């Protein structure tokens, strides 16, 4: 599983010119799901996301989490994070999870995040326009793969 986490002052996602998700201060998270991922990876990633300390404290040090600042998350499914261009110029997505299973795991991630902070989401399988104001900019990539 792979997360691209961007600290934002605001973000929104549109499908067919309709806003389907919108947040203020928090994270825009691009979520890539690998074909071998399970809820075990998802739980690890959500825990890491909630504890990640990239918001400034009173001394302007990145020391606060999304929960500390009562921030929001906009979660965007993005299978292209597992695009492999090692052998070709056209990406292969063979490492990405199949859509039906990936959608279930994406929804699981959304529900688990929502239990902790206000969470909005993109539309799985749709062509989306994502707008954000990246604050800092701060962008963190988090990856986790368990060896079974």
Curated annotation (Swiss-Prot):
Gene Ontology molecular function terms on file: D-tyrosyl-tRNA(Tyr) deacylase activity; Gly-tRNA(Ala) deacylase activity; Ser(Gly)-tRNA(Ala) hydrolase activity; tRNA binding
A GO term from the CC aspect: cytoplasm
Entry keywords, A to Z: Cytoplasm, Hydrolase, RNA-binding, tRNA-binding
Protein's GO biological process: D-amino acid catabolic process
Motif (Gly-cisPro motif, important for rejection of L-amino acids): 136-137
Protein's cellular compartments: Cytoplasm
Catalytic activity: glycyl-tRNA(Ala) + H2O = tRNA(Ala) + glycine + H(+); a D-aminoacyl-tRNA + H2O = a tRNA + a D-alpha-amino acid + H(+)
Enzyme nomenclature, EC number: 3.1.1.96
tRNA-binding among keywords: yes
Pfam families in alphabetical order: Tyr_Deacylase
Gene3D superfamilies named among the record's database cross-references: D-tyrosyl-tRNA(Tyr) deacylase (3.50.80.10)
Enzymatic class: hydrolase
Family the entry assigns: Belongs to the DTD family.
Subunit structure of this chain's protein: Homodimer.
Record comment regarding domains: A Gly-cisPro motif from one monomer fits into the active site of the other monomer to allow specific chiral rejection of L-amino acids.
Function per UniProt: An aminoacyl-tRNA editing enzyme that deacylates mischarged D-aminoacyl-tRNAs. Also deacylates mischarged glycyl-tRNA(Ala), protecting cells against glycine mischarging by AlaRS. Acts via tRNA-based rather than protein-based catalysis; rejects L-amino acids rather than detecting D-amino acids in the active site. By recycling D-aminoacyl-tRNA to D-amino acids and free tRNA molecules, this enzyme counteracts the toxicity associated with the formation of D-aminoacyl-tRNA entities in vivo and helps enforce protein L-homochirality.
Protein name: D-aminoacyl-tRNA deacylase
Organism: Methanosphaera stadtmanae (strain ATCC 43021 / DSM 3091 / JCM 11832 / MCB-3)
Gene giving rise to this polypeptide: dtd
């Amino acid at each position: 599983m792979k997360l691209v986490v961007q600290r934002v002052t605001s973000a929104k996602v549109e499908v067919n010119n309709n806003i389907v998700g919108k947040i203020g201060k928090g994270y825009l998270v691009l979520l890539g799901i690998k074909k071998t991922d399970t809820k075990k990876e998802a739980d690890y990633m959500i825990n890491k996301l909630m504890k990640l300390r990239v918001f400034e404290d009173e001394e302007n040090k990145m020391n606060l989490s999304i929960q500390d600042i009562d921030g929001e998350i906009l979660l965007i499914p993005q299978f292209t994070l597992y695009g492999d261009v090692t052998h070709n110029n056209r990406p292969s997505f063979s490492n990405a999870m199949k859509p039906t299973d990936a959608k279930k795991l994406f929804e699981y991630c959304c529900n688990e995040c929502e239990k902790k902070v206000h969470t909005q989401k993109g539309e799985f399988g749709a062509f989306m326009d994502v707008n954000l104001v990246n604050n800092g900019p701060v962008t963190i990539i988090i990856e986790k793969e368990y060896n079974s």
